[in-house]
């Protein structure tokens, strides 16, 4: 049994070698010749999986170690009798922590408290729900918009997008990319929406590049609209609008979900799905794969305020480390993908062990996802 895996999927060789012969290959472009005798294909979002790639090939199963699936033609796979699995929620925590790192940086730079801001969350799936929970744990007001969930009657106080635009100081997008249909998200943030944002608002896109109309956004910024922008995703990736990058406050190369934990979850989820597909079901404990974190433990004295939270968050991950490298190589062919391929190891907040002498600080840090304990000062 031959299994092709994206060369940037951590732990893929280690896990899939339990099931057969493993060949690691580039994801963009994928070497088509390798598909001629392969039984399974494990990809990331950079690989377009469709009829033109797989027609006439012996592939029986496709797995994507990503939450999103807009790069996969699921309907064609089903029609062709090819098994499929994604990894929903695998990088949700990573994306939430990316958003927090960005917001805390902007709050420090511009001198505002997040408690004074209302956050509008567009898309309330695995990422949106977790973001809502962590923001509300801090006492930050949130507004939710998710028309598909609202129409299904899912639990939640869902508002219209117009309401979020009118009332939110921060608007952050966490939707799939739907190019048509009743829940179309292509250019959901169009020129009209962008121009309607509150003066000084913050716009964040960490889902799919085309959810925000990049051309319209650049036009508004060039005209002097007072707006802070965080973009992790771009229309036309791996190409991007260099002029837009110059205008945004934070720009990164589609790495919001790139924690070691998130990547490992993606790999293990598709590994477990494929092992079940072939009748050799196996389960993997994530902590048996992950290395020890860089920081063993730290001690926190007193209450948890915003500056202290910012220091803790940026101790684990400061978004500026990914902004600067992209600006240096923007516009150079191949460099966007190279940054992603050679991405420095990044951990989640849970890797940081925090000893607190204040019980409320320990409790709040646990709600936020840190590994915190209370030890009263002696």
From Swiss-Prot:
Main location, first listed in the record: cytoplasm
Q: Does the keyword Cytoplasm apply?
A: yes
Which EC class heads this enzyme's classification? oxidoreductase
What are the recorded GO MF terms, alphabetically? 4-phosphoerythronate dehydrogenase activity; NAD binding; protein dimerization activity
Protein residues bound to substrate: 45, 66, 258
Reported EC number(s) for this entry are: 1.1.1.290
Subcellular location(s): the record lists: Cytoplasm
* Active site positions: 208, 237, 254
Specify the pathway.
Cofactor biosynthesis; pyridoxine 5'-phosphate biosynthesis; pyridoxine 5'-phosphate from D-erythrose 4-phosphate: step 2/5
Query: What's the domain of life for this entry?
Result: Bacteria
A cellular component term, taken from the record's GO annotations: cytosol
Tell me which residues bind NAD(+): 146, 175, 232, 257
Could you say which protein family the record assigns here?
Belongs to the D-isomer specific 2-hydroxyacid dehydrogenase family. PdxB subfamily.
Function, as annotated: Catalyzes the oxidation of erythronate-4-phosphate to 3-hydroxy-2-oxo-4-phosphonooxybutanoate.
Q: How does it assemble?
A: Homodimer.
Q: What is this protein called?
A: Erythronate-4-phosphate dehydrogenase
């Amino acid at each position: 049994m031959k299994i092709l895996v994206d060369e940037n999927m951590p732990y893929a060789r280690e896990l899939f070698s339990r099931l057969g012969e493993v060949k690691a290959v580039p994801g963009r472009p994928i070497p088509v010749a390798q598909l001629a005798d392969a039984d399974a294909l494990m990809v990331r979002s950079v690989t377009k999986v469709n009829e033109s790639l797989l027609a006439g090939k012996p592939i029986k199963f496709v797995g994507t170690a990503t939450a999103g699936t807009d790069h996969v033609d699921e309907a064609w796979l089903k029609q062709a009798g090819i098994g499929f699995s994604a990894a929903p929620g695998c990088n949700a925590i990573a994306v939430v922590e990316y958003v927090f790192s960005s917001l805390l940086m902007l709050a420090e730079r511009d001198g505002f408290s997040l408690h004074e801001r209302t956050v509008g969350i567009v898309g309330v799936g695995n990422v949106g729900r977790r973001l809502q929970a962590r923001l509300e744990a801090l006492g930050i007001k949130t507004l939710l918009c998710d028309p598909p969930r609202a129409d299904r009657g899912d639990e939640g106080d869902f508002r219209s997008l117009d309401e979020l635009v009118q009332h939110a100081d921060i608007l952050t997008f966490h939707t799939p990319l739907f190019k048509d249909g009743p829940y179309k998200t292509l250019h959901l943030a169009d020129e009209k929406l962008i121009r309607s944002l509150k003066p000084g608002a913050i716009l964040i896109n960490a889902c799919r590049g085309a959810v925000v109309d990049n051309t319209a956004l650049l036009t508004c910024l060039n005209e002097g609209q007072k707006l802070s922008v965080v973009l992790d995703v771009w229309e036309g990736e791996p190409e991007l609008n260099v002029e837009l990058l110059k205008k945004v406050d934070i720009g990164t190369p589609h790495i919001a979900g790139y924690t070691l934990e998130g990547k490992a979850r993606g790999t293990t989820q598709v590994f477990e799905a494929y092992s079940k597909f072939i009748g050799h079901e196996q389960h993997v404990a994530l902590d048996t794969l992950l290395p020890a974190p860089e920081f063993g433990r730290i001690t926190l004295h007193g209450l948890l305020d915003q500056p202290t939270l910012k220091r803790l968050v940026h101790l684990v991950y400061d978004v500026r480390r990914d902004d600067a490298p992209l600006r240096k190589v923007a516009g150079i062919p191949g460099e966007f993908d190279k940054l992603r391929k050679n991405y420095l190891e990044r951990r989640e907040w849970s890797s940081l062990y925090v000893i607190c002498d204040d019980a409320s600080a320990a409790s709040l840090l646990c709600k936020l996802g840190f590994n915190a304990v209370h030890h009263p000062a002696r």
